[in-house]
């Protein structure tokens, strides 16, 4: 069996400091993310494309878990498939070691680039320059979070001509151990544009909000030195954003101040949220939390009393007021 044709361009990449690993792909097919990307946040990732053998994804991850190198894995995959020259596959382990194979029966232009920390591969491309521009964009944005670097790489590919047939779907998946929503799983970012006339633009639009609604909150929850630069980058990005909602500012402010990190930024964001939604008692509670975390108990009390004035029967606000009064009297 030849399997389905998934001509595409992809990047597999890892951040060896934060321990994030991800894949981004775009193609003129429906739902490129359905078959191409396979990721295990503890071991590595596999991208299987062209005349895709989807078995390579699961088997590749199993072999990574067993400690095989990316080259050894591709050699094993080759030995198991009589139609291997139709395939294109890339493997990257969590340490940034990668390897790729492009069969000589792939539709041109087809090729790959491998280096420490990333594997870039594509087939049915307008030219070799598509891959070169992907690499250039990825390397020139090293100060940004991995997900954003992957998206910028895909955008560069599209600008360089991308898939010769056109565009339809894109996917970006980034995993980090316990980096998913509330730590339930590992999906830090999972954005799928399955059928669109402008998949890159849609991907960027959704990511713009995703990075604050989900990714930054996960970074804050996991908060450690390895993630600090990403947290600072995203907080600064939020400061200059002009179209975020009150909820976005409030959610981040609460996470920061309840964990006693970057409390000054948290206070700034909570006040922005209040300006956007001045009668929201929950935002007033967040402002109080930020003042409390900064040791300004009188202002915390002031904002809690404002919140209670709006929701006069709120027992939570009443208990918080008594708590803050106790701190003032200590």
Question: Which residues fall in each region the model found?
Answer:
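N-terminal nucleophile
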Residues: 6-223
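Alpha-helical adaptor scaffolds
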Residues: 220-225, 235, 239-290
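TPR/TPR-like (Sel1-like) alpha-helical repeat modules
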Residues: 292, 297-315, 322
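Charged, low-complexity interaction regions
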Residues: 226-228, 313-314
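Register position in tetratricopeptide repeats
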Residues: 258-259, 293, 323-327
